Amino acid sequence: AMADAGVKYGLTKQQALTLAAQAVAGSAEMVLSCGEHPEKLKDNVCSPGGTTIAAVCDLEKNGFRGIVQSAVCACVAKADEMSK
């Protein structure tokens, strides 16, 4: 989805995939390396009135947390089903 948005705004598919992967990898590395809760990290990287907080607000408005939790629950349920 992130890469598709990049293409929408003029990046090539490869550029968009690379940037999206780097963003995800960078976020994961930050969580793994510093030991801070992701909420604290979010607070650290979001500037007042900035682009990141605008994106975070949009994710929250559109139910991102619930969508991710639902997907994890579906994965666990399917894994349980497959293990029987």
Predicted segments with their positions:
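Anionic-ligand binding region
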Residues: 1-18
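NAD(P)-dependent Rossmann-like dehydrogenase/reductase catalytic/cofactor-binding core
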Residues: 17-84
